[in-house]
């Protein structure tokens, strides 16, 4: 399920924008020029998988603006998407060296 979500069109663009700053729905929609239903679907998937957090900001109106922010898990997903993009640009004879370590952050 995670790979299916990350492979969706515009997911990387959303994560990149949220990596630079928290944004509300209409900011994302205007910046990406996406239909609201498409953006809502992408954001719902990202929130459900823990890549993005959703919170309601203060507002004098009945409905406040909903802000979205990238989570640490979302930042790691963005790094993986960047790595995949780099892998796609490799030429014959080139290789990627990856150093990684899995740590238990609850210890």
From Swiss-Prot:
GO terms for molecular function, please? Answer: DNA binding
An example of a Pfam family matching this protein is HTH_45
Instruction: Give UniProt keywords alphabetically.
Output: DNA-binding, Transcription, Transcription regulation
Membrane spanning stretches: none
Q: Where is the signal peptide?
A: none
Protein name listed in UniProt: Uncharacterized HTH-type transcriptional regulator MJ0361
